[in-house]
């Protein structure tokens, strides 16, 4: 008889509206313009998604000067790009489409607004993440990047100066709260974003993990090692009671021996990971264990971002 495992499935999980839109944009471009369609940077941080789109005719590049045939369309990734990138595309006479998530575009607009008001801008985010690079490239003025509470303390700004802050969309809700608290403590005149910059999907997926983490001996987060929202889910699972939590980048290579003395497993998928990978993981576990699956009750997300009309076939 197979060993029994209790599976706790977090919900909501998997693709968010911005990821859905970005992938749909690449597919629509392939339908309308044929192969190849160039994509600047991974459209979303997920190997499965990228490989699938490659097989359909997408060619992934990091810089526009890598485009061999300048008559072919190019799509910018969901993470957003500095203003210099669309300008370069215009200079090269490229047909381009911008798949930046609308929630990231909102932050770009906030940065531009604060810059026009001549407020120093603090960006809470992870250095070298594509989203952060894109946000910092919305203005020629200096943006002060902070990753920790300690970074806030070191900022070379006057405490009575009117300052503004924005955040990366895929941060830990808890960590960001601590940093924002420090910003407000350190400075007397802080202008906040009108709405929280951490996106609904990041928040919802972290909350879903928090609800079940304490039931779990082991937590599996399906996602990529270069995906900020995936890594934050691993941290949240550990911080909220799961004895162990790991990132699963490749279901096929997951070693099942790690579950030898385990009874309760939590599973979620990051906002850039498709539900098909959750199914694949559960099927793999079913083939080796007797599973009791506990699916979380949750409200379905009803957010949808439209693909630009000019991409429709």
Regions found by a protein language model. Name each.
Residues 1-265, 269, 275-313:
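The feature marks the mature, well-folded catalytic cores of soluble enzymes
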């Amino acid at each position: 008889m197979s060993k029994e495992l209790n599976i706790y499935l977090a919900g909501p999980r998997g693709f968010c509206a911005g990821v859905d839109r970005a992938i749909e944009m690449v597919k629509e471009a392939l339908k309308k313009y044929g192969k190849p369609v160039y994509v600047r940077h991974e459209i979303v941080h997920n190997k499965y998604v990228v490989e699938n789109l490659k097989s359909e005719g997408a060619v992934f590049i990091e810089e526009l000067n890598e485009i061999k045939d300048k008559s072919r369309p190019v799509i910018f990734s969901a993470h957003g790009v500095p203003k210099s990138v669309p300008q370069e595309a215009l200079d090269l006479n490229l047909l381009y489409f911008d798949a930046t998530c609308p929630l990231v575009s909102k932050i770009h607009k906030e940065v531009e607004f604060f810059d026009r008001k001549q407020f120093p801008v603090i960006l809470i985010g992870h250095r070298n993440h594509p989203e952060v690079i894109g946000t910092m490239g919305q203005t020629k003025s200096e943006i002060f990047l902070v990753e920790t509470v300690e970074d806030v303390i070191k900022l070379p700004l006057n405490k009575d100066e009117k300052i503004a802050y924005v955040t990366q969309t895929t941060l830990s809700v808890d960590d960001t709260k601590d940093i924002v608290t420090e910003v407000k403590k350190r400075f007397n005149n802080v202008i906040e974003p009108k709405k929280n910059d951490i996106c609904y999907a990041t928040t919802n997926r972290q909350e879903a993990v928090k609800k079940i983490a304490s039931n779990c001996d082991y937590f599996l987060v399906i996602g990529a090692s270069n995906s900020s929202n995936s890594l934050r889910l691993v941290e949240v699972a550990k911080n909220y009671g799961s004895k162990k939590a790991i990132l699963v980048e490749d279901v096929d290579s997951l070693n099942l021996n790690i579950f030898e003395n385990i009874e309760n497993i939590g599973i979620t998928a990051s906002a850039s990971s498709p539900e098909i990978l959750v199914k694949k993981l559960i099927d793999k576990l079913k083939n080796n264990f007797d599973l009791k699956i506990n699916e979380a009750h949750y409200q379905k997300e009803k957010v949808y971002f439209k693909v630009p009309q000019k991409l429709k076939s």
